[in-house]
């Protein structure tokens, strides 16, 4: 597997830009940790810096077709679906001035017919080649509280802006043609498929899956997931690891929010990983997100347990498809903790 070369990057820019740079650009792989192993194996994001340094581009390169396995709805979105959703998000954000500059990539072009299909986008602000992007999850602990709070606040504002993009149908792109309008029906289908695939892959025992399906029936009977009137654009895996900061001005700035396009879907905003107790969402993040907060009642905490279970299963199933030594201990712990908590979790 060869990475994107400066020569390839220059050709991509020359294909899609009216005035492409003539000098060879600088290309750096955007390092993602604690992310979906199958998405990381299938798609690689690269930062492309041009001289003179007026714009920084983001090229998402597809290395292989995502294997679907026994749970096709948990597989990464196609690159065409990713571009369609990213474009819809950009159109939505452009429809009105945001309260603060939002760090989402701005789509430029899709080439699904290239030997290695790609999405070309640009960063909303200039990023010098010397700037180092670091994940918020990696640097937050070393920041002064006021700086960490400022970054979390902006993260919350950006999440709310993303979730304000809504749809008439629920689920990932493969379900669009079915026009499902009930989030409860949609999520039940997603999690049941994941549970059955986890049992087949020896990720979960038959006994545990049967018990969880019983808990799910109880939740459905209590209409636990039926409070989502209009589904929002959520990315499932977006947390502090999706937020990239830089300190080019001497103070950490939120430079890029890269939601996992591979798992974008329309559903419950609470599905976003940023709201998982395992992420320890800060007061500043929730303040930036605004009202209504994602969790108010006990039943919403139970919903988040189900979403943690689903997140963990999707990651473990993805790791199984990729093979090799994948760091998914956190996902296994998430599944086990959710399994235990859901046994007695209230649905009312």
Please state what every model-predicted region is.
Residues 1-26, 340-348:
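Regulatory N- and C-terminal appendages and interdomain linkers associated
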Residues 32-185, 193:
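ATP-binding pocket architecture of kinase catalytic cores
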Residues 9-24, 109-113, 119, 141-149, ...:
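An alpha-helical support segment within catalytic cores of ATP-dependent transferases
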Residues 229-233, 245-305:
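Active-site Asp-x-Gly
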Residues 269-295, 308-326, 333-342:
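Active-site activation/catalytic loop segments of kinase-like enzymes and analogous catalytic loops
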Residues 51-56, 83, 119, 166-189, ...:
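Intrinsically disordered, low-complexity segments that are common in secreted/host-exposed effector
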Residues 23-35:
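Conserved N-terminal boundary motif of the eukaryotic protein kinase catalytic domain
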Residues 2-3, 32, 48, 61-72, ...:
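Membrane-proximal envelope and lipid/glycan-remodeling enzymes
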């Amino acid at each position: 597997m060869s990475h994107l070369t400066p020569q390839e990057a220059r050709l991509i820019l020359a294909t899609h830009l009216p005035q492409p740079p003539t000098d060879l650009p600088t290309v750096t792989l955007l390092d993602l940790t604690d992310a979906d192993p199958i998405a990381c194996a299938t798609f690689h994001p690269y930062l492309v810096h041009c001289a003179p340094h007026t714009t920084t581009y983001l090229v998402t390169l597809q290395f292989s077709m995502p294997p679907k396995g026994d749970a096709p709805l948990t597989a990464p979105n196609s690159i065409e679906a990713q571009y369609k959703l990213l474009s819809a998000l950009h159109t939505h954000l452009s429809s009105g001035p945001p309260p603060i500059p939002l760090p989402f990539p701005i789509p430029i072009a899709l080439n699904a017919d290239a030997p290695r299909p790609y999405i070309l986008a640009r960063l909303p602000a200039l990023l010098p080649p010397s700037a180092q992007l670091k994940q918020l999850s990696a640097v937050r602990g070393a920041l002064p509280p006021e700086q960490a709070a400022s970054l979390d606040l902006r993260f919350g504002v950006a999440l709310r802006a993303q979730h304000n993009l809504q749809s008439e149908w629920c689920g990932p792109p493969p379900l669009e043609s079915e026009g499902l309008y009930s989030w409860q029906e949609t999520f039940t289908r997603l999690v049941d498929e994941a549970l059955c695939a986890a049992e087949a892959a020896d990720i979960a025992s038959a006994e545990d899956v049967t018990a969880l399906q019983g808990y799910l029936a109880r939740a459905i009977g209590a209409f636990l997931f039926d409070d989502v009137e209009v589904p929002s654009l959520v990315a499932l895996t977006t947390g502090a690891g999706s937020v990239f900061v830089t300190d080019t001005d001497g103070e950490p700035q939120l430079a890029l929010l890269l939601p996992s396009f591979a798992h974008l879907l329309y559903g419950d905003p609470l599905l976003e990983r940023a709201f998982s107790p395992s992420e320890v969402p800060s007061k500043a993040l929730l303040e930036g997100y605004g009202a209504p907060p994602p969790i108010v009642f006990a039943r919403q905490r139970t919903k988040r347990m189900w979403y943690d279970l689903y997140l963990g299963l999707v990651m473990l199933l993805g790791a199984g498809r990729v093979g090799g030594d994948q760091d998914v201990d956190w996902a296994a712990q998430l599944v086990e903790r959710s399994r235990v908590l859901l046994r007695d979790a209230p649905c009312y």
